[in-house]
Amino acid sequence: MKKYVIFDIDGTLNQTALYAIEAYQKALKKRNITVSDDVIFACIGLSPAAIITKLFGSLDDNAYQVWRKDIQEYEFSIMKDRAKTFDGIVEVLCELKRRGYQLAICSNAYPKHIKQVLTMIGIYNYFSEIGSLKMGNSKAEVLTKLLEKLNCQKACLVGDRKFDLEAARVNHIPLIGCGYGYAPNEIQEADVVINKPLEILEGIDYLI
């Protein structure tokens, strides 16, 4: 029986705040825009379009492309020294693979960014499939297409935001909500809520 554990990235696998807040502040300062770190923190895990709406309201295509270029450059520069997984994630991924689970990603980002981040934090090779914004306009849509591609008998999503919960519900699979992530108040209705990565293993055993 083919079983998949499907992971969100930001706030689930990756300690994104370690580099993203500074990168965004640099890009905003370049545009003479001042926002609090809390505003940027709330953007972590959102789709690129949702981040633009939250920070700017709207941008024309040229301004958007320049913005994305700046963010990518600032993030990559800072990531080289700071990027890392949450403690225990590598051990969890290794153990899930040992137990015979297949691993996949479901993300609000685009493939190039996903590969860059997962490679930088040293876990890219654990995942056999990547679900990205190329597959849909929302996390629920991405997960639908990903599940169709995986054609698995059982699956569980692991994430830390309300759109992870929504995606799991729309697609009728259980969610492990990461209380250690960036929006613990958003995932209290998950099937299992955990407080540290190592608890993912017990949650998976219980749910699938």
Name these PLM-found stretches.
Residues 2-4, 139-165:
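Conserved Lys-Pro-Asp/Glu-containing loop-to-beta segment of HAD-superfamily phosphomonoesterases
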Residues 24, 92-119, 133:
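Substrate-recognition element of Asp-dependent hydrolases with the DxDx(T/V) motif
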Residues 54-90, 94:
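Metal-dependent phosphoesterase signature
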